[in-house]
Amino acid sequence: VMRVFFVFPGQGTQRPGILHGLNTFGLSVLEEMSNAIGLDLLTLDSAEAFERTENVQLALLCAGIGKCRELEAAGIQPSLVAGLSIGAFGAAVAAHALSLTDAARLVLLRGRLMQGAYPSGYGMMAIGGLNLNTAEDITNAVDDIYVSNINSEQQIVLSGPLSSLDIAAKRAKDRGALYAKRIQVTVPSHCPLLMCPAKVLMEAFQKVEVKRPKVPYLSVNSGRVIWDPTKLVDDLAFNMARRTSWLDAAQAAKERGIDVLIEMPPGGILGSLAQTTFADGLVISSSTTPAEEIIERIGRLQ
């Protein structure tokens, strides 16, 4: 049996209109989430609405779970799930550890807390072509910035005030970086600057039932599989304030014998970053590959 890995991306991959082309699976998720939060998600799917973190995060959860349900209905079952940042909530729903209704409410709160903590003047920046040691040298020399995501051997993300990121960009280029570019996130995610909102989110989790996952849930913060519901709550609540390593998570998935990585919408960034890790398997972006074709490609691999 092919071992399939469902991966849910984080912010930075979104584009307005993502919820306007949903099929019946996506529309039922949209309706369930809209009812849960008392807002029509379709009205939050525009360039203007996407300037607010919570609207982007809700759209990503909706698109991801819609696709997940479509693939499962077509007979593609995951052996492992993981999500980067907001994607972790999609992974927890896919693992049957968190209900979609609870996830929708928590994600709305999470986005509002993140946006409220840093309404403006903060962000994230991807640096290409420098290793982790060099990136950490740069963050140590510039105030208030942190290494927040280790995406691959050659891509590191920094978080902090925009003024400090500008200084870091110049230093990175001086050290030989191929690029230093801002990503579409308006808050300093995955660093200690978000510890206060994370604690508030943790309190909200106390009113929610989180079960033992039915599908192994891989943390992109620790690179380990989590079964214990208490540890899962900790992972979901605090992931906004902790460094992520997609590099380590992809490696951990490979070591668990994963043959096929399927990235949920939107985009295919995590899959392309993990291409070298899964060189002898299949990496598929479900945004651009119809379910029938995914089944066919998995069949050819067997």
Regions found by a protein language model. Name each.
Residues 2-134, 179, 260-290:
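FabD-like malonyl-/acyl-CoA
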Residues 183-186, 254, 286-287:
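Short glycine-rich catalytic loops that host catalytic nucleophiles or stabilize transition states
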Residues 11-12, 35-39, 95-241:
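Alpha/beta catalytic cores of group-transfer enzymes, especially the acyltransferase/condensing modules
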Residues 23-24, 142, 173-174, 276-280, ...:
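Short, solvent-exposed amphipathic alpha-helical segments in soluble enzyme
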Residues 241-258:
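A short, acidic, amphipathic alpha-helical segment used as a generic capping/interface helix at domain edges
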Residues 222, 282-302:
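Short, flexible loop segments at boundaries between secondary-structure elements
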